Regions:
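N-terminal presequence-like segments and the immediate start of the first folded domain
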Residues: 1-56, 60-73, 79-129
């Protein structure tokens, strides 16, 4: 997997890459939207707790396929409240630890549960060999 930012496009406005090249044969994991819910179904109380829970959930999904955060090729982050962006980005950076997948950020009017503040879906890729 190779991250790149073409010279003919303005540089990234955050911690992401404009493109991710994945060569075959690769194993792919398409992660459904993860939210800030623990294994008992309890929703985190605030954006910080929900963000940490969802990144732990992503780690668990990836581990189920023998992958890790650095295998994420693309992610989409959905936020309900614009004022939560700073905390959500800070925690995202903590978990990505310098990894720069292709990324999209969306602000939405709401998510599937009225108490959810954030959701992240992703695609991960790892060599089959």
């Amino acid at each position: 997997m190779r991250a790149f930012n073409p010279a003919g496009v303005a540089g990234p406005f955050g911690s992401y890459s404009h493109g991710i090249e994945v060569e075959s044969p690769m194993r792919l994991v398409f992660g459904s939207g993860q939210t800030g819910v623990d294994t008992d179904g309890r929703i985190g109380e605030d954006i910080e707790e929900q963000s940490r829970l969802l990144w732990r959930n992503i780690q668990e999904v990836l581990a189920g396929a023998g992958m890790k955060i650095s295998d994420i090729a693309q992610l989409t982050m959905l936020l309900v409240r614009r004022e939560d962006l700073g905390i959500a980005r800070e925690i995202r950076e903590e978990y990505l630890d310098g990894h720069r997948p292709a990324s999209t950020l969306l602000f939405v009017a709401g998510l599937a549960h009225p108490d959810w503040l954030i959701e992240v879906d992703f695609v991960a890729a790892r060599s089959s060999g």
